[in-house]
Amino acid sequence: MRAVISALLITVVIASAATVTAPASAAPQAAAPQACPAYLDHEFRKLHSSQTINICKAFAGKPLLIVNTASHCGFTPQFKGLEATYQKYKGRGLVVVGFASDDFNQEAKDEAEAADTCFLNYGVTFTMLSPQHVKGPEANPVFQELNRQTAAPGWNFNKYLVRADGKVLQHLDSKVAPESSEFTTAVESLLK
């Protein structure tokens, strides 16, 4: 008797599952993910690491704050404010990406030293990339496009606010500190 009841229960469960499951063609279509702009679809090596990151794959559809950085610059203390910005807004989707660069001859010649400046001295937890060019004909593909849409960095710690669709919203120069109301207003505008 128990065997018959068990068999009937199994049959009912299977039949119920078959009627509840809709055919794949009837399933609602999810919205297509936003296409990532080609200029962000590149592999970059992380600072003082062998690991690489593709900005599109890692951060597609998220607003970005992209900054060219250097570890021996008068603006280097901005790392602290950039980290505070990242901590404050990451819950709202903001991603901060620092591109170390020696284009203005102020980056440490040793990547370990540059990493210590960022990670140990300033407690940076946002993505930092290995030194590369951010201006001129040798600029990496990200900065080629940022420079095209706005302006090339005139110094270290230029900040580029990039919408989730890849369009550059605003370029802020080195003198605009992460703690300033101008900067905060720009970030808030990006996240609307």
Which residues are covered by each model-predicted region?
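Amphipathic alpha-helical repeat scaffolds
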Residues: 68-72
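Thiol-/selenol-based redox modules, centered on thioredoxin-like
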Residues: 141-144, 148-192
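Bacterial N-terminal signal peptides
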Residues: 7-17
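A short beta-strand-turn-helix
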Residues: 42-63, 84-89
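Positively charged n-region of N-terminal signal peptides that target proteins for export
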Residues: 1-4
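Structural microenvironment flanking redox-active thiols in thiol-disulfide oxidoreductases
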Residues: 75-139
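Loop/turn elements at helix/coil->beta-strand transitions in domains of secreted/extracellular proteins
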Residues: 60-64, 90-95, 122-127, 156-157, ...
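N-proximal helix/coil linker or "cap" segments that precede and/or mark the start of modular domains
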Residues: 20-43
